[in-house]
């Protein structure tokens, strides 16, 4: 289809309300319109190529136009594109559920599908709450999470989140819970570490964890869940949980009979360097989390699919006679769609055939080594992350850690310079966000980090 490029730009500004975008500024600026993708690159309507340094918002795993995933979608489309999962099965959804149970911790045995991460979290919330109701424990109406946590933009997901910037305006609509202070090592309320690296070198008493445990112990009888992101707080600015934090919370949940939900929508499928963050011995011993949320990379970033996994114990509480109305009343039109599940099956096959988790380890090591060079720059306060999820926090004053005002758009100033160098990056406030695809090459890693170094120097900060 040959459409005039100027007309596309005009219609984009005239008809589309873009997410997380100040449309006044967007309508006044030159808009980037992507036409296609090749490998790790996005290509705009003018043929310009950009390294996709945020994996199209943290979902693309193996680059764009990966033939195995596209062929799987095409082959399924030749059979059937969609039939309902309400009281009726379909082949790809069954095969994928078995596969997910096989590759996640063994105590997670049941799969509930949805189309995006926020819905996966909504389902987890409903499962946890109704579990206690069916158990006869109807007094549990609160949750516990951390301030600045992010779990999606639907009402339930916003409620258990804690982002004042994103969701503050909706507070009157949200249900109530308790929010602990986040384990934000760079801006720790208990210590004055120079940066996250210094905290990791020196260690601490984990006061943030103790605060969370105290909250769980104090409110256990009124709480139906504790929910955390898997190893790193993504939208808060790529803030890693200190080693042992999540395991400590899981232990407290087990000791106080509180369901623990781990949101790995963003962190699952290799992002933190492991297939899943919850794939560690301590959590396996505790048989936690009770509920696991997956999404984003589940289809390689090609189609919208998410999944909520849980245990036999939780699932069994929902079993009964039809008239008892114990069933989980949740489900959307495209739940368990065949095209989506086929894309996910092809994605998981790539993980197996190409030994992806083992092969990305040297690239992750190189990535973090190259990023350390940024710390010498005047306005780089902190470089932090896990695996291929990294945040670089820009500050007005490195000694005092004074942040730039939100409206100064420090991160976007760097993003504009990167775009000139053929790299697409979307920041969050003053934090440069890097979430490259797992398929990024060593050469591309070095170019990305070198270009970022220069972009920060060139930006008007």
Swiss-Prot record:
Substrate binds at residues 150, 296, 331, 426. It is an enzyme of class 2 (transferase). One of its GO terms (molecular function) is pyridoxal phosphate binding. Pfam families: Aminotran_3 (PF00202). Its EC number is 2.6.1.62. It catalyses: (8S)-8-amino-7-oxononanoate + S-adenosyl-L-methionine = S-adenosyl-4-methylsulfanyl-2-oxobutanoate + (7R,8S)-7,8-diammoniononanoate. Catalyzes the transfer of the alpha-amino group from S-adenosyl-L-methionine (SAM) to 7-keto-8-aminopelargonic acid (KAPA) to form 7,8-diaminopelargonic acid (DAPA). It is the only aminotransferase known to utilize SAM as an amino donor. Homodimer. This is Adenosylmethionine-8-amino-7-oxononanoate aminotransferase.
């Amino acid at each position: 289809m040959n459409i005039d490029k100027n007309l596309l730009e005009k219609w984009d500004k005239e008809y589309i309300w873009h997410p997380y975008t100040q449309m006044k500024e967007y309508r006044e600026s030159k808009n980037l319109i992507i036409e296609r993708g090749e490998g790790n690159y996005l290509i705009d309507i003018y043929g310009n190529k950009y390294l996709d340094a945020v994996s199209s918002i943290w979902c693309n795993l193996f680059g764009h136009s990966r033939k195995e995933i596209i062929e799987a979608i095409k082959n399924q489309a030749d059979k059937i594109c969609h039939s309902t999962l309400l009281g009726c099965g379909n082949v790809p959804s069954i095969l994928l559920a078995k596969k997910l149970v096989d590759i996640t911790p063994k105590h997670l045995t049941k799969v509930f599908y949805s189309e995006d991460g926020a819905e996966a979290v909504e389902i987890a919330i409903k499962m946890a709450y109704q579990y206690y109701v069916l158990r006869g424990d109807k007094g549990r109406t609160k949750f516990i999470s951390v301030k600045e946590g992010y779990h999606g933009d639907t009402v339930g997901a916003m409620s258990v989140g804690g982002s004042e910037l994103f969701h503050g305006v909706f507070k009157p609509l949200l249900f109530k819970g308790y929010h602990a202070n986040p384990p934000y090592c760079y801006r720790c309320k208990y210590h004055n570490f120079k940066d996250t690296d210094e905290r990791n070198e020196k260690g601490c008493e984990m006061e943030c964890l103790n605060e969370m445990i105290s909250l769980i112990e104090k409110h256990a009888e009124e709480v139906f869940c504790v929910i955390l992101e898997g190893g790193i707080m993504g939208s808060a600015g790529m803030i890693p949980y200190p080693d042992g934090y999540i395991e400590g919370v899981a232990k407290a949940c087990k000791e106080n009979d509180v369901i623990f939900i781990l949101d790995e929508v963003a962190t699952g499928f290799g992002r933190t360097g492991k297939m899943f963050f919850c794939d560690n011995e301590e959590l396996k011993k505790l048989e936690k989390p009770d509920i696991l949320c997956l999404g984003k990379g589940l289809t390689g970033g090609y189609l919208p699919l998410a999944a909520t996994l849980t245990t036999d114990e939780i699932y069994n509480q929902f079993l009964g006679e039809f008239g008892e109305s114990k069933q989980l009343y949740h489900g959307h039109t495209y739940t368990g769609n065949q095209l989506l599940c086929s894309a996910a099956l092809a994605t998981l096959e790539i993980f197996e055939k190409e030994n992806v988790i083992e092969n990305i380890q040297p690239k992750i090591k190189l990535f973090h080594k190259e990023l350390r060079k940024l710390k010498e720059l005047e306005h780089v306060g902190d470089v932090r992350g896990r695996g291929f999820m990294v945040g670089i926090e820009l500050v007005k004053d490195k000694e005092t850690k004074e942040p730039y005002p939100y409206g100064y758009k420090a991160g976007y100033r760097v993003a504009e310079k990167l775009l000139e160098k053929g790299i697409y990056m979307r920041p969050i406030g003053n934090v440069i966000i890097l979430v490259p695809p797992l398929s990024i090459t060593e050469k591309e890693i070095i170019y990305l980090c070198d270009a970022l170094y220069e972009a920060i120097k060139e930006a008007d900060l």
